[in-house]
C-alpha cells in the first residue's frame, strides 16, 4: 500500500474532504460605488439644518440656496406709478370700432324710449289656455331687444298645413308689414299645440303721433283666425307716455269687470283657494290643467 500512504501525507485534510472548493476565498466587492466627496453623515446634515433654522431631514448637496429680497431693501420703490396725459392729436380709431360704440349708444337710447303697452298673455296661464281653446291662436310672450321685437305664438294644432304671420304697422295702420313666423319644435311631443317664433325690426325714429301696433294671423284649413288682443291690438308706445298714464291714475291700477272675473272665480279654483281661502284644499278643474311649456 505505498501509494495510499503517499497521497494521505501530501493532501491536507480540508482539500481531501472538499476537493472542489476554491483555493482562495476572497470577499465580494459591492456593485455600487459611493462618491467620497458626497459622503455626508446624517448627523452633520441635521446639525447644519438646525443651525440654519430650517427643519429639513435631507439636503441635496450642490444645490444653490434660494434667497428672497424686496425692492425696498435695495432702496427702490415698491410700486411704479405711470401718468397718462391727453394726446394733442386725436386717436385714429378704426371705422368698425367707432360704428360699434355709436350703434350701442343709439340702441340703448332707442330701447329706453319704447315699451310694451300690454301684459304678457302667458302671465295668467288659465286665461291663456282658455284663449287658445276658444280662439285657436294667442300670443305667448313678447319682448323688445335692441331695435327689434321678438316673441312666440301658441296655436291649436288643427291641421298639419298651417301658416302663422305677424302683421305690424309703424304708422297707425296707414300701411303694414307681414312677417312670417317660424315653427319651433317642442321639447315634449304629443301636445295639441304648436309654437311659432317671430322677429321684426323696428324703425329708428317713430313720430309721437303715430303708434306701433301688431296682431297675429293664423291660417289653417282655409280659415283665417286672428289674435288682436281682444280687439285692442298689441301696442308698442314710448315709455314717457306710459309713465304719464300711470301718474294720471294716481299710481293705482284700474280694474274692469272682466278683471274681477279673472281673480274671483268660483270657490275651489286654484287661484281662489290659493289667494282668498288658502286653507281650502280643492282639485276642481285639476284634470283640465296640462303641462305649460
Swiss-Prot record:
Q: Which PANTHER family does the entry mention? A: PROTEIN PHOSPHATASE 1 REGULATORY SUBUNIT (PTHR12307), PROTEIN PHOSPHATASE 1 REGULATORY SUBUNIT 3B (PTHR12307:SF13)
Query: Which species is listed as the source?
Result: Danio rerio (Zebrafish)
- GO annotations of cellular component type: protein phosphatase type 1 complex
What superkingdom does the record give?
A: Eukaryota
Q: Does the keyword Lipid metabolism apply?
A: no
This chain belongs to the protein called Protein phosphatase 1 regulatory subunit 3B
Q: What does this protein do?
A: Acts as a glycogen-targeting subunit for phosphatase PP1. Facilitates interaction of the PP1 with enzymes of the glycogen metabolism and regulates its activity. Suppresses the rate at which PP1 dephosphorylates (inactivates) glycogen phosphorylase and enhances the rate at which it activates glycogen synthase and therefore limits glycogen breakdown.
**InterPro entries of this UniProt entry?**
CBM21_dom, CBM21_dom_sf, Pase-1_reg-su_3B/C/D_met, PP1_3B, PP1_regulatory_subunit_3
The domain section of the record reads: The N-terminal region is required for binding to PP1, the central region is required for binding to glycogen and the C-terminal region is required for binding to glycogen phosphorylase, glycogen synthase and phosphorylase kinase.
Q: Which UniProt keywords apply?
A: Carbohydrate metabolism, Glycogen metabolism
Which stretches make up the CBM21 domain? 129-237
Query: One Pfam match, by short name?
Result: CBM_21
Any one GO molecular function term = protein phosphatase 1 binding
Please list the GO biological process terms of this entry.
Answer: glycogen metabolic process; regulation of glycogen biosynthetic process; regulation of glycogen catabolic process
Please describe the quaternary structure of this protein. Interacts with glycogen, PPP1CC catalytic subunit of PP1 and PYGL. Associates with glycogen particles. Forms complexes with debranching enzyme, glycogen phosphorylase, glycogen synthase and phosphorylase kinase which is necessary for its regulation of PP1 activity.
The answer on whether this UniProt entry bears the keyword Mitochondrion reads no
Amino acid at each position: 500500500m505505498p501509494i495510499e500512504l503517499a497521497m494521505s501525507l501530501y493532501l491536507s485534510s480540508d482539500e481531501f474532504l472538499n476537493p472542489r472548493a476554491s483555493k482562495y476565498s476572497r470577499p465580494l466587492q459591492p456593485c455600487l460605488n459611493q462618491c467620497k466627496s458626497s459622503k455626508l453623515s446624517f448627523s452633520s446634515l441635521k446639525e447644519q439644518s438646525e443651525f440654519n433654522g430650517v427643519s429639513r431631514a435631507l439636503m441635496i448637496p450642490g444645490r444653490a440656496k434660494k434667497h428672497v429680497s424686496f425692492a425696498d431693501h435695495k432702496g427702490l420703490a415698491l410700486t411704479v406709478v405711470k401718468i397718462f396725459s391727453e394726446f394733442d392729436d386725436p386717436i385714429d380709431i378704426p371705422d368698425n370700432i367707432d360704428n360699434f360704440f355709436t350703434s350701442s349708444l343709439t340702441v340703448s337710447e332707442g330701447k329706453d324710449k319704447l315699451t310694451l303697452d300690454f301684459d304678457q298673455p302667458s302671465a295668467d296661464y288659465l286665461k291663456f289656455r282658455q284663449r287658445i281653446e276658444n280662439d285657436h291662436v294667442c300670443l305667448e310672450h313678447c319682448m323688445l331687444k335692441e331695435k327689434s321685437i321678438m316673441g312666440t305664438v301658441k296655436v291649436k294644432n288643427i291641421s298639419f298645413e298651417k301658416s302663422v304671420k305677424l302683421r305690424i304697422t309703424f304708422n297707425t295702420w296707414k300701411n303694414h308689414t307681414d312677417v312670417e313666423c317660424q315653427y319651433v319644435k317642442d321639447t315634449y311631443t304629443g301636445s295639441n299645440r304648436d309654437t311659432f317664433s317671430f322677429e321684426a325690426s323696428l324703425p329708428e325714429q317713430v313720430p309721437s303721433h303715430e303708434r306701433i301696433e301688431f296682431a297675429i294671423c293664423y291660417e289653417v284649413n282655409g280659415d283665417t283666425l286672428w289674435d288682436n288682443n281682444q280687439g285692442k291690438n298689441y301696442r308698442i308706445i314710448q315709455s314717457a307716455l306710459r309713465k304719464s298714464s300711470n301718474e294720471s291714475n294716481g299710481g293705482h291700477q284700474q280694474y274692469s269687470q272682466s278683471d274681477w272675473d279673472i281673480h274671483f272665480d268660483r270657490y275651489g279654483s286654484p287661484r281662489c283657494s290659493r289667494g282668498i281661502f288658502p286653507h281650502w284644499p280643492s282639485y276642481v278643474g285639476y284634470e283640465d290643467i296640462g303641462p305649460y311649456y
